From Swiss-Prot:
Subunit organization: Component of the BAT3 complex.
PANTHER family per the UniProt record, alphabetical: UBIQUITIN-LIKE PROTEIN 4A
Protein role: Component of the BAT3 complex, a multiprotein complex involved in the post-translational delivery of tail-anchored (TA) membrane proteins to the endoplasmic reticulum membrane. TA membrane proteins, also named type II transmembrane proteins, contain a single C-terminal transmembrane region.
Protein name listed in UniProt: Ubiquitin-like protein 4A-A
Domain Ubiquitin-like: 1-76
Naturally occurring in which organism (per UniProt): Oncorhynchus mykiss
Pfam families reported in the protein's UniProt record: Tugs, ubiquitin
Keywords: Cytoplasm, Transport
Length: 154
């Protein structure tokens, strides 16, 4: 199938792939055509960021789909998940969770529970769309704004 990749500013390109290709492979093809290093690419489909390790079929991307390309400046960290997993605050949360789980479960069960929680957390982050992130940021940055729906906070 042929996908169209459109940078926010610049000329689009087409890449020939199968639905079983990984997003990282698409980035390599785009890198060859547009001379943008794969490490600086962030591909979006219908507003959602695509994770390198996932296949196109995981996102139901079909023939003649159009992907948007955001080019990150060199040296910038990759995505929300990359920043969150390397953050000491998140590391501290996982350490605290490990301590709490150890009090209530056997070591093997605690490890299984924590592993599943980490997977669920990372999956949830990957599924956030740019719209979701903008809404969340707006609510966190302007919690007292009138006209803003805060019923979810109850």
């Amino acid at each position: 199938m042929i996908l169209t990749v459109k940078p926010l500013q610049g000329k689009e390109c087409n890449v020939q792939v199968t639905e079983d290709e990984k997003v990282s492979t698409v980035k390599e093809l785009v890198s060859e055509r547009l001379n943008i290093p794969a490490s600086q690419q962030r591909l979006l489909y219908k507003g959602k960021a695509l994770a390198d390790e996932h296949r196109l079929s995981d996102y139901s991307i079909g023939p003649e789909a159009k992907l948007n390309l955001v080019v990150r400046p060199a040296g910038e960290r990759s995505g929300v998940a990359g920043m969150a997993s390397s953050s000491s605050a998140v590391g501290g949360v996982w350490q605290t969770l490990s301590t709490v789980l150890a009090k209530h479960f056997s070591p093997a069960d605690a490890a299984k529970v924590q592993e599943q929680l980490v997977k669920d957390y990372e999956r949830s982050l990957r599924q956030l769309s740019m719209d979701d992130i903008e809404r969340l940021a707006g609510r966190l940055l302007h919690p007292d704004s009138e006209g803003m729906d805060t019923s979810y906070m109850d």
